[in-house]
């Protein structure tokens, strides 16, 4: 049977949303055999180092964050953004240079950064985006969890705590099959 997944190349470590139809139970030793229908690759990035020299590049503009959770060694973020008019926007997960991997409180301290590159957010026609950050460079097993500093458009600056490093996928994240392709890097 044909499927709609054509001209897609797998990329090691890239996260994606797969829409499929189950075909068979207990298929050659697997739980189920499937027919892929669509695949939506997500922007997949690593944790970056924040220094005095590159702080302006990461910026810290308010972001429209919808949901965040950690699973499979990734911090997964669902966000809304205005479609860029001139430059791709930049979303980043950063760790301050020179700080220990695990702080005195037992947590890994990170920051979510957003750079609009001067685009205004006054005319807001939101589009949903997803970014997944690979956390494999961090000592997750040795830490109590992650404390994440965010700058939300609705609530301002906050710190979120994540103790569960393998959360179930939120229900709203299971409905991303209509996601638009955003211009972010």
Residues of each region from the PLM?
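N-terminal post-signal-peptidase region of extra-cytosolic proteins
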Residues: 2-6
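Short, solvent-exposed, Trp/other aromatic-anchored flexible loops in extracytoplasmic proteins
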Residues: 9-14, 115-146, 153
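Surface-exposed beta-loop interaction hotspot
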Residues: 26-80
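Short helix-loop boundary/capping segments
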Residues: 63-119
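Flexible glycine-rich surface loops and low-complexity tracts that mediate binding to linear polymers
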Residues: 7-33
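Short acidic/polar inter-strand loop motif in beta-rich domains
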Residues: 21-30, 140, 150-160
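Short beta-strand elements
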Residues: 154-184
